[in-house]
C-alpha cells in the first residue's frame, strides 16, 4: 500500500509533477525524521529504548547499525508473503523475463561481456561486446546499463565522458556488504530438523556490534532460511534445502587468498578453495551447535559462494549484494541517478537507486523504460506513468493500444527436483 508514492523516479517527471512529488515524499518521510540521528551502537540502543524498555527485546535488533534500519523493514513485511520468490524459486523471474523478450521477437544474448560504450558527439550510439572470444558490435539509440556503475564509468567509457568529481563520489560511496552463501541439500525435510517458514537470525549477543558484522565466521551474524519448506518443487520428496547467509567482505584474509593477473582477473588457487571450505565449516558448525543438532549428518552436498563468487557472476564492486546503501552520506552525494553524463545512456539496475533487492531492481527497470518512452512513445509513457502513480488500474494498462498484446503463453520450466521425480515414474505412468 502506498508504494506508488516512492516507485516513480523524479527524473521521469515534469516540473510540476516533481513539485507535487516533493510534498508526497515529505509526507512519506516525516514519520522517520525524528529517528534519523539514532545510529551507531550507543545511538541504536538509545533509540530502541524509546520503544522497548526490556533489554531482551532491544537485543532482537542487534544486527542493525541505525534505528531506521530496524523500523523500515517492518514496513516491508507484506501480508501473504508478497516478496517471497514464486513457485520454482527466484530463477523463475529471469526465465519469465527471457520468455517475454523472446515472445516479442527480440534477442537475448547470454555469456556476453560488454567492453565499450560507443559515443558520438556526447551521445551513446552503440556498444561492443565479447562472446566466447569473438568481438561484436551493436548500434543502438539508447542503452540501459544494469551493471556495476564504476565498471561502466571507468572501463566502458572514455575517461573524459564522466566528471572526475562524480567518479570520486562513487568510489567513496557506502555499499552493502557481500556475503558467504551456503546452499545445503539435505537427506530429510527441513521440518525434521526443527526449521519452519521464518527466517532465523543467529547472533552472539555478547559480541559488540562491529564483531557481529565483521565478516569473521566465528562472530558474524548468520541468517538461515529453508526454501524447500515453502516451495516443495525445490527438493525431491523426503529431502530438503537450507540456505545459510553471512555478511562478508572482499578484503577478508588477503582478499580470500586470491591474486590478480595482468588482465585484472582474480586467480583462485588451492589456498582460496581451502579458505572457502574452512569458512563454510565454521558457519555450518555454528548453526549445528545452536539451531539444528546433527545437521552435518544430513547434508548430501552443498555449494559455497564467497564475495569472490558474487563478484565473478555479477561484476558488482567487491561482490556487494545490493549496491549503495540508503543513508545520509549517499543521499548528500547524490549517488543514485538514472541519467548518466552521456546522453541516452541510462542506468537501469540497482545502482540507479539506493538499496537493493527485487523491488528496487524492478523500480529501476521500470523508471529506465519510462525515460525512453517519454521521448519515443508518449501514449505509452503516460499510461505507464499513470499506473506507477496509482492513477490507472492494471486492467486499463493491459487494454491500452499503446502496448502490444501478450498471450500469457509462458509455462514455468520444471525444477531439477521435478525432473528427477518425472524420470523415476514408470513408463506410461
Where are the language model's segments positioned?
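Active-site/ligand-binding neighborhood in enzyme catalytic cores
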Residues: 3-104, 111, 309-326
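A glycine-rich dinucleotide-binding beta-alpha-beta segment and adjacent secondary-structure elements
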Residues: 53-68, 223-225, 284-354
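Mid-domain catalytic core of redox enzymes
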Residues: 85-86, 115-236, 389
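Beta-rich nucleic-acid/ligand-interaction surfaces
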Residues: 108, 112-129, 301-316, 387
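C-terminal segments that line or cap access tunnels to active or ligand-binding sites in enzymes
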Residues: 187-305
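A conserved FAD-binding loop/helix module that cradles the flavin
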Residues: 350-373
Amino acid at each position: 500500500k502506498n508504494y506508488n508514492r516512492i516507485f516513480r523516479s523524479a527524473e521521469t517527471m515534469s516540473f510540476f509533477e516533481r513539485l507535487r512529488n516533493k510534498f508526497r515524499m515529505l509526507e512519506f518521510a516525516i514519520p522517520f525524521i525524528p529517528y534519523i540521528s539514532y545510529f551507531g551502537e550507543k545511538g541504536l540502543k538509545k533509540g530502541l529504548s524509546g520503544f522497548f524498555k526490556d533489554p531482551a527485546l532491544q537485543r532482537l535488533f542487534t544486527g542493525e547499525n541505525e534505528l531506521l534500519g530496524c523500523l523500515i523493514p517492518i514496513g516491508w513485511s507484506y501480508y501473504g508473503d508478497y516478496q517471497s520468490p514464486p513457485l520454482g524459486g527466484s530463477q523463475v523471474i529471469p526465465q519469465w523475463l527471457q520468455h517475454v523478450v523472446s515472445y516479442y521477437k527480440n534477442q537475448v544474448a547470454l555469456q556476453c561481456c560488454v567492453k565499450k560504450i560507443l559515443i558520438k558527439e556526447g551521445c551513446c550510439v552503440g556498444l561492443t561486446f565479447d562472446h566466447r572470444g569473438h568481438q561484436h558490435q551493436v548500434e543502438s539509440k539508447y542503452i540501459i546499463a544494469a551493471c556495476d556503475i564504476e565498471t561502466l564509468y571507468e572501463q566502458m567509457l572514455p575517461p573524459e565522458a564522466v566528471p572526475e568529481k562524480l567518479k570520486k563520489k562513487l568510489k567513496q560511496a557506502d555499499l552493502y556488504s557481500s556475503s558467504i552463501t551456503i546452499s545445503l541439500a539435505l537427506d530429510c525435510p527441513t521440518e525434521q530438523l526443527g526449521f519452519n517458514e521464518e527466517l532465523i537470525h543467529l547472533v552472539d549477543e555478547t559480541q559488540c556490534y562491529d564483531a557481529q558484522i565483521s565478516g569473521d565466521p566465528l562472530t558474524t551474524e548468520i541468517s538461515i532460511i529453508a526454501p524447500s519448506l515453502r516451495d516443495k518443487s525445490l527438493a525431491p520428496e523426503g529431502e530438503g534445502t537450507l540456505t545459510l547467509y553471512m555478511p562478508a567482505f572482499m578484503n577478508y584474509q588477503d582478499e580470500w587468498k586470491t591474486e590478480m593477473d595482468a588482465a585484472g582477473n582474480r586467480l583462485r588457487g588451492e589456498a582460496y578453495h581451502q579458505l572457502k571450505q574452512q569458512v563454510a565449516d565454521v558457519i555450518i558448525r555454528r548453526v549445528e551447535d545452536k539451531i539444528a543438532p546433527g545437521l552435518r549428518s544430513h547434508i548430501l552436498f552443498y555449494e559455497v559462494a564467497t564475495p569472490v563468487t558474487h563478484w565473478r557472476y555479477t561484476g558488482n564492486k567487491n561482490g556487494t549484494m545490493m549496491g549503495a546503501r540508503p543513508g545520509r552520506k549517499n543521499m548528500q552525494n547524490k549517488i543514485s541517478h538514472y541519467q548518466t553524463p552521456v546522453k541516452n545512456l541510462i542506468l537501469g539496475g540497482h545502482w540507479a537507486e539506493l538499496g537493493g533487492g527485487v523491488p528496487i531492481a524492478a523500480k529501476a527497470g521500470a523508471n529506465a523504460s519510462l525515460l525512453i518512452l517519454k521521448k519515443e512513445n508518449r501514449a505509452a509513457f503516460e499510461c505507464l506513468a499513470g499506473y506507477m502513480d496509482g492513477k490507472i488500474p492494471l486492467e486499463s494498462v493491459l487494454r491500452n493500444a499503446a502496448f502490444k498484446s501478450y498471450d500469457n503463453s509462458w509455462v514455468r520450466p520444471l525444477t531439477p527436483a521435478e525432473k528427477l521425480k518425472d524420470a523415476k515414474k514408470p513408463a506410461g505412468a
